[in-house]
Amino acid sequence: GVVRENCALNPSNPYEISKTDFDEILQTTARNFKVEVCLVRPSNVYGPDMRNQSIQQMLNAIQKNVFAFIGPEGASANYVHVHDVVQALDLCLDHPKAANQTFIISAWATMEEMVSGLAGGAGLNPPSRRIPLTLATWLAMTMQFWSRWPLTLSRVQAMTLRSRYSTEKIEKELGWKLTVPIMDGMREFAQNCRHS
């Protein structure tokens, strides 16, 4: 489904829980002291000089020719380039309509487009190997006690999500526009890894 600013929050890891708790404290404090705040909720932030562990592991698997897509085509990749986050933060600081609002910042591509960008940036053809979701889930559950096994349940879930983060609100209210599509950003990420 589509995730919007007014959707119920469902934090599932320590980072998400702490961010949700802080957002609630900030909103309460702002109301009590009549201070304007603006909450920004970026999806997975990455950039050419940022070492995002999940993207790096995916790139490594592509380079070693062991990467496989999971389940049917069209899974969601919700990431946002650091330049687009900075642009959004600048708008939130300066725009009067940002006061006491929450904005999602994200870009969307299919998992196939994301992987194609990474492979292209690494100078490789994109992989096409695909394993069924049931097999991937079974492998992740069966091998979960072997710490070196790369396919975890959380990774299976991340590779098969169908949700999409809507940026309609910040686009309409503040004029934010995506400048780095995921495929281009992933190509840049992989190229930077090649040259570093």
Map each language-model feature to its residues.
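Short aromatic/basic micro-patch
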Residues: 2, 39, 76-79, 164-165, ...
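Amphipathic terminal alpha-helices
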Residues: 167-172, 177-196
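Glycine-rich "substrate-gating" loop/helix at the edge of Rossmann-like oxidoreductase active sites
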Residues: 12, 43-52, 72-82, 161
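Glycine/proline-rich active-site loop of Rossmann-fold NAD(P)-dependent oxidoreductases
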Residues: 20, 33-35, 47-57, 91-103, ...
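Mid/C-terminal beta-alpha module of Rossmann-like enzyme folds, strongest
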Residues: 91, 95-151, 183-190
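A conserved pocket-lining segment of Rossmann-fold NAD(P)-dependent short-chain dehydrogenase/reductase
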Residues: 8, 60-80, 84, 88-92
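Conserved C-terminal active-site "lid" loop/helix of NAD(P)H-dependent oxidoreductases
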Residues: 82, 113-116, 139-177
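Active-site Tyr-X1-5-Lys
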Residues: 10-38
